[in-house]
């Protein structure tokens, strides 16, 4: 077995091992390393609607997960939905983990470095979006930056390691010493030098060109997007480095 195949097999086994564990639970090792749960599995304590207070009623607890419940899609916002963000502002280096799954043709995203200020109307005005979506939406389409694992409008994932609709996907986001790394289902799909010319150019040419991150300011909230379709999140964890 080649080294590459062995590495891939190791990650696959790790993914199955994670799913065999209890959801929304910190292991003794995670506690020792300083991880904290952002979602208890029972309520949305620690979260609020972007620019408001309580999350909309479309955000529910289902299957020990945060669920945006959209029985019938009608536009890009769910009735009584809206984007939600954590209460804690993150400054400096950190790690983030979560599981997500979607319904057919669903579209959502996990946002980082979100600023919640009156001059910003939407979460996506400032937040860097890691796409959460059913990639069949884009079957046959020209390569774009709107598929799962992509940074929306900024950078493509270098691999398309997505599980089928209805199955859980594991994302691991790390920002450390100006290096940004994202793994999806155990495979590294994004690696960027945030102080480098390539990354700065990508941000400057995106819809985030006027956002604080375009000026090298990487702090803020983490958010979950309501884009008018059903999606679940669980095992949402944070470690400040």
Model-derived features with residue positions:
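Bacterial Sec-dependent N-terminal signal peptides
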Residues: 1-23
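Carbohydrate-interacting regions of secretory-pathway proteins
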Residues: 21-241
